[in-house]
């Protein structure tokens, strides 16, 4: 699987069509939105499903927990949760950006998730 850094580098900041913000309840076939391809020609990087990465969810250098919600991320820096990138059909438009990180445990069954292999 790709690392979180590799997927982020491949992302596009464009506002081209994708499947998020409940625009569809179901994923669409890969390649359905060619206008949303990154500058590297990689398609379907935002929307249609969170993409699993091989990167454990961990704090960035200088991380400080939010005063109003300290357990939001820190409780999940346990080596059992992995970074997910992109967005799913159920992701709100405000959260859709190349730098947003989500996280889940690999065996969690209730997430719109996809994965991508790279050489």
Can you annotate each of these PLM segments?
Residues 4-98, 109:
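Functional-site microenvironments in short loops/helix caps that host divalent-cation chemistry
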Residues 110-119:
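Short, structured beta-strand segments at or near domain termini in extracellular proteins/domains
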């Amino acid at each position: 699987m790709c690392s979180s850094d590799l997927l982020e580098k491949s992302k596009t900041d464009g506002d081209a069509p994708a499947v998020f913000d409940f625009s569809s309840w179901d994923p669409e076939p890969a390649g359905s939105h060619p206008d949303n391809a990154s500058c590297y020609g990689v398609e379907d990087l935002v929307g249609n499903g969170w993409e699993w990465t091989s990167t454990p969810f961990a704090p960035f250098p200088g991380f400080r927990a939010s005063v109003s919600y300290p357990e939001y991320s820190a409780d999940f820096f346990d080596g059992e949760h992995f970074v997910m990138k992109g967005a799913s059909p159920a992701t709100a438009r405000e959260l859709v950006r190349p730098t947003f990180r989500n996280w889940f445990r690999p065996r969690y069954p209730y997430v719109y998730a996809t994965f991508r292999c790279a050489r």
